[in-house]
Amino acid sequence: MKKDSVIIVSGGMDSVTLLYEHKDEIALGISFDYGSNHNAKEIPLARMHCERLGIEHITIPLEFMGRYFKSSLLEGAEAIPEGHYEDENMKSTVVPFRNGIMLAIAAGIAESRGLRHVMMANHGGDHAIY
């Protein structure tokens, strides 16, 4: 199978599952450091899983998101809500257009490298906020 894909891999369970499911198609794993409270733990895991599979991994810094966007998911913001992952709790964790920004960058990198596909594993429980 031809390695003609880029994957956006956070290091969380959704993107890592997609990484393993399509490992034979993926030429590049991309993580984004956008100031999330989870980045320090998840990005090293994304890198580790890519290395384990022999897939190149890069991390792209997006510091501007932490400075200009409001979300409880970002470092220095209000606490992330505890409890069940309900619609109201989810709304405070939204980083506005985060996935769109990451997808646009990944698509540009894919195009620049002659890769045909971009893979992204969005969390199914986020439906209420989009």
Predicted regions and their residues:
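ATP-dependent adenylation/nucleotidyltransferase module used to activate substrates
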Residues: 1-130
